[in-house]
Amino acid sequence: MRNNTLKIYDMLSRGGFIAADSLDSTTRHLFDDIEENYEDYADYYREIGLRLEAGNGYYFFSRINEGKQIIEQKLDSFSKWLDYLDFLKCYDQTFTAGFQFRKSHIIEQISVDLELKEKAGRLFKKYDSSSNQDIVTKLIQEMMTIGFAECINETDETYKVTSAFRYAEELVNMIQIANEDEIPE
């Protein structure tokens, strides 16, 4: 067993990501350790039913032999990220790994862009979030919880999108490619 097995498990088992470009030195160290010892970690986690997956600058877990119900739950859970991604790309088409943004700028853009305002209103309907600030705060919290963004300046609330965000983009691209490949009736 490698030294960081438990730390890696704790971060990834909750649906998070370990990104190469994280601001957190511990996370970057874990990324480097996984990269150097990928086979050892992959073999270990495989024994407990987890698949250590590598993306473009990030790592995550998937389960081996997931049942249909679990896959459906994951798809349902990911459907909200389709809306989030749509909103973020509407805010700025260059919103991807490495992008930096300020919370206040997104809030300002919502107030001047009708399409963005409509998309924002649909993001957290079940919470009845009426203020743009609440909506943006919840979105940023979700991005930070999963590891898609990190705060780089607490004073002016500036954030950086991590390479783990590519996971969401890649899933959406796979869905779009699958739809394009379908033969119309």
Give the location of each predicted region.
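A short, conserved structural fragment
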Residues: 46-54, 144-154
